[in-house]
């Protein structure tokens, strides 16, 4: 590298995004982070700061509002060598081949190393199992989508760049299907759709909330069972905003049991994390083009809670 903080261009990837005619005047960093699920907003901001983004041929600021019809050019640098450590952490591998891997992530496991979590993450475990995984730099995480630390369930991993592009395209086109199970307080209608924009909570920037100027977000749910004051839901994401299911269900008035951020302060159920599990994942295989489906049963801690509720109901 030619200097500290700079990115050496070896085999850079060029991308072009045309702002759609219906797009509102949103900040360019937020717009690009939403348009490209494989890049976080912080990564987009870094690209902008280092001159790897052009807006109608000029270098923008991160706060630049986008306009319909504008052309945005991005240069995605190659992976940055990191100090990531491969750790032989056991993984529940639901499926693997030369192109993808599907992992059943346990609750409590962080997906990416971050300040405070340099070890013991899913990425550390993946590097031990797949030494050739294209995951080396922060701009190429290799992981197509994320789950919160205390959400369990299915994640798909791209084992090379071609698979990554295919899976990201499926996410952007909303062809990838993700279904969760959530236990909530209250009894919602049997089916419903929550169509409400999500953004940073203006009262607490560490939380997300339904806000008028947020990014479009849509969640579908179906009632599976009821246990007194509690309901088990099947939840399907149409979009993938941060904390979307947790925020939307709280907004609807049915917070997730055990959610330390968006749930009730007290619960009579002894659960150390939110009752949210990614139970189903459907996608088109990047190489074969065939539709594949994967499932993961509820983990033991969530099954215990359901049995407790079933036992209570049988006594009344």
From Swiss-Prot:
UniProt-listed Gene3D superfamilies: Pseudouridine synthase, RNA-binding S4 domain
Keyword Isomerase included in the entry's annotation: yes
Keywords, ordered alphabetically: Isomerase, RNA-binding
PROSITE patterns: PSI_RLU, S4
Catalysed reactions, as listed in the record: a uridine in RNA = a pseudouridine in RNA
MF terms in GO: pseudouridine synthase activity; RNA binding; rRNA pseudouridine synthase activity
Record-listed E.C. numbers: 5.4.99.-
GO terms (BP aspect): enzyme-directed rRNA pseudouridine synthesis
Entry-linked InterPro entries: PsdUridine_synth_cat_dom_sf, PsdUridine_synth_RluA-like_CS, PsdUridine_synth_RluC/D, PsdUridine_synth_RsuA/RluA, RluA_PseudoU_synthase, S4_RNA-bd, S4_RNA-bd_sf
Active site: 148
Matches recorded under Pfam families: PseudoU_synth_2, S4
S4 RNA-binding domain mapped to chain residues: 26-98
SMART domains documented for this protein: S4
Family: Belongs to the pseudouridine synthase RluA family.
Name of the featured protein: Uncharacterized RNA pseudouridine synthase Caur_0901
């Amino acid at each position: 590298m030619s200097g500290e903080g700079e990115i050496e261009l070896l085999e850079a990837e060029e991308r072009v995004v045309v702002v759609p005619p219906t797009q509102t005047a949103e900040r360019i960093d937020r717009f690009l982070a939403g348009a490209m699920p494989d890049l976080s907003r912080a990564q987009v901001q870094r690209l902008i700061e280092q001159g790897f983004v052009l807006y109608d041929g000029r270098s923008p600021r991160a706060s630049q509002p986008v306009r319909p019809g504008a052309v945005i050019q991005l240069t995605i640098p190659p992976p940055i060598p990191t100090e990531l450590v491969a750790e032989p952490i056991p993984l529940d591998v639901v499926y693997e081949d030369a192109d993808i891997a599907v992992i059943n992530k346990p609750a409590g496991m962080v997906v990416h190393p971050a300040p405070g979590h340099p070890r013991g993450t899913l990425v550390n475990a993946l590097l031990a199992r797949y030494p050739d995984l294209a995951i080396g730099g922060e701009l190429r995480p290799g992981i197509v989508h994320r789950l919160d630390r205390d959400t369990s369930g299915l994640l798909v991993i791209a084992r090379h760049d071609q698979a990554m592009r295919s899976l990201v395209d499926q996410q952007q086109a909303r062809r990838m299907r993700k279904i969760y199970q959530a236990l909530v307080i209250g009894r919602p209608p049997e089916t419903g759709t929550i169509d409400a924009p999500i953004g940073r909570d203006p009262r607490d920037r560490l939380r997300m909330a339904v806000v008028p100027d947020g990014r479009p977000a849509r969640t579908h749910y179906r009632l599976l069972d009821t246990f007194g004051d509690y309901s088990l839901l099947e939840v399907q994401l149409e979009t993938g905003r941060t904390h979307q299911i947790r925020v939307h269900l709280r907004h609807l008035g049915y917070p997730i049991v055990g959610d330390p951020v968006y749930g009730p302060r007290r619960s009579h159920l002894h659960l150390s994390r939110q009752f949210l599990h990614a139970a189903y994942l459907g996608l088109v295989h990047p190489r074969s083009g065939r539709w594949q489906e994967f499932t993961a049963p509820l983990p033991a801690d969530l099954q215990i809670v359901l049995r407790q509720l079933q036992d209570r109901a049988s006594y009344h």
